[in-house]
């Protein structure tokens, strides 16, 4: 193993063991119909059909790798003296020291495993075949010798769908961005978002399969101090609950407060977080209902693995050189498939602006 990771050929993965890689490392999810990429610290650029004209998350590839990019998750635990200790199992943006870190780069999925502050967090990120919803399947396990009270806060920052306009029209774009709330029974909530001129055509949606005790949709409020707070330490996360602000303009985000509750020593709690786009909230509900069930999520993940197993099985070689085998059997066909689907249109270098 080198200082950054190793190949796990038996499961067709590359395992990153140090998130501070010399360059950002991305993995493609889904397809051009709905998809994008996730980097080695959980930042994601997601779009539907055209990253120039229907981009969903705000991810600037030129930004320093230590900063927030598009999506993240926070965990928080109460301090004895009051307030909360806040950290991200993705390492970025809190840059919290870790006892273990793995980003397992698979075929159409990434699995993150981190251990810090007495908690082990596993996050599987993928898009089911043929679907327009991104799944983050989260499991938090208490490794400490006493019970811990844990909150989970997933966050996404939206961009204007016209990706170039987001960068060059600072006057008009913020006036168009709006967030909406659809409250369900038993505390379940769907936060949706769209520029007002598109809201009757489609909505981005963000939700979870656990009750949402509070939410935030205004970036300035989330960061705190009139926006002078930071993604590394958002001011609102020192409060018991988020503000329940519905942004009618400005920089739209979606953040959900999920109280995992007290986790006894050695036990786990799980959550499923969903990000997608549909023709209105009603159009999103069938996908939300299906993929809020962990049984259906596991079934969709197995279908994704079966798809890649069938694709790779068409041609396999066995030579005296395991590196050559790895390239021909796994990574070259994967690269060809990704290039065919994305046409070198969206990456860290091809920015997908049209």
Language model features: what each stretch is:
Residues 1-354:
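Anionic coordination/interaction segments
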């Amino acid at each position: 193993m080198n200082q950054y990771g190793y190949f796990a050929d038996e499961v067709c993965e590359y395992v990153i063991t140090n998130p501070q890689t010399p360059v950002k490392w991305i993995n493609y999810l889904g397809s051009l119909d709905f998809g994008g990429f996730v980097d080695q610290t959980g930042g994601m650029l997601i779009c539907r059909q055209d990253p120039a004209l229907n981009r969903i998350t705000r991810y600037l590839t030129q930004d320093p790798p230590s900063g927030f990019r598009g999506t993240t998750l926070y965990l928080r635990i109460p301090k004895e003296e009051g307030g909360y200790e806040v950290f991200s199992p993705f390492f970025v943006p809190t840059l919290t020291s870790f006892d273990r870190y793995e980003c397992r780069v698979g075929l159409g999925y990434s699995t993150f495993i981190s251990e810090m502050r007495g908690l082990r967090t596993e996050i599987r990120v993928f898009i089911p075949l043929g679907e327009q919803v991104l799944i983050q399947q989260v499991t938090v396990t208490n490794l400490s010798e006493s019970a811990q009270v844990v909150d989970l806060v997933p966050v996404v920052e939206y961009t204007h769908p016209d990706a170039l306009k987001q960068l060059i029209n600072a006057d008009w774009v913020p006036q168009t961005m709006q967030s909406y709330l659809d409250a369900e029974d038993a505390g379940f909530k769907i936060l949706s978002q769209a520029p007002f001129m598109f809201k009757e055509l489609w909505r981005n949606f963000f939700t979870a399969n656990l009750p949402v005790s509070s939410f935030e949709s205004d970036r300035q409020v989330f960061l705190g101090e009139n926006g002078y707070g930071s993604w590394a330490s958002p001011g609102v996360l020192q409060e018991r609950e988020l503000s329940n602000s519905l942004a009618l303009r400005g920089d739209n985000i979606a953040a959900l407060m999920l109280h995992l509750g007290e986790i006894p020593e050695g036990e786990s709690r799980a959550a499923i977080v969903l990000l997608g786009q549909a023709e209105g909230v009603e159009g999103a509900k069938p996908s939300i209902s299906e993929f809020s069930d962990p049984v259906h999520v596991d079934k969709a993940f197995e279908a994704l693995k079966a798809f890649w197993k069938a694709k790779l099985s068409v041609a396999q070689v066995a030579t005296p050189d395991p590196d050559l085998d790895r390239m021909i059997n796994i990574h070259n066909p994967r690269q060809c498939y990704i290039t065919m689907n994305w046409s070198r249109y969206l990456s860290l270098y091809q920015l997908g602006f049209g």
